[in-house]
Design a protein with these regions (language model features):
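Conserved catalytic core of the tyrosine transesterase superfamily
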Residues: 1-168
Length: 168
């Protein structure tokens, strides 16, 4: 239950592993559908969770472990009721990759890359993605956004102004 909530949150929000691990019980506001993140440089941001399945996974975890997580103060805890570590999150990702038969080496940070890239490919403004990821500089965000060659071609065919000019 916890593992699914961790994986769902990583992919749905693009949070850094360190941000997920330091997420406090009071930082998760499921009724409002948002989490408060303390990013690099002690920057605070709010990230919305719009997907009902993600909210459901977080709610199930929160209800099942309410006593433990309220007592510890951390939202995601290990079996010793301590906050999850970065290594624990890597182990969770590896475990579910093995179970799914994924042979490629997948890291938790790849969820962040995928989050940014998929939003960009769906036409989301890079400045909005920058805010979601908590980047100070747009240059940092551009590193995360790998647009596939075919997608670039489709965008150019569909959006480039030259395609709307027809000579007789």
């Amino acid at each position: 239950m916890r593992d699914i909530a961790v994986l769902e949150l990583l992919f749905a929000t693009g949070v850094r592993v360190s941000e997920l691990c330091t997420l406090g019980y009071d930082d998760v506001r499921l009724e409002e559908g948002e989490i408060k993140i303390y990013g690099k440089g002690a920057k605070e941001r709010f990230v919305q969770i719009a997907n009902p399945n993600v909210l459901g996974a977080l709610h199930c975890y929160q209800e099942a472990y309410k006593d433990v997580i309220t007592q510890s103060g951390a939202f995601f805890v290990n079996r010793l009721h301590k906050p999850l570590s970065d290594q624990s999150v890597r182990s969770i990702v590896n475990k579910y990759c093995r179970l799914a038969g994924v042979e490629s080496h997948i890291t938790p940070h790849m969820f962040r890359h995928s989050f940014a890239t998929l939003l960009l490919e769906e036409g989301v403004d890079i400045r909005y993605i920058q805010r979601l990821l908590g980047h100070s500089s747009i240059l940092t965000t551009q590193i995360y956004t790998h647009v596939a060659g075919k997608k670039q071609r489709d965008i150019l065919l569909e959006k480039h102004p030259r395609n709307k000019i027809h000579f007789a």
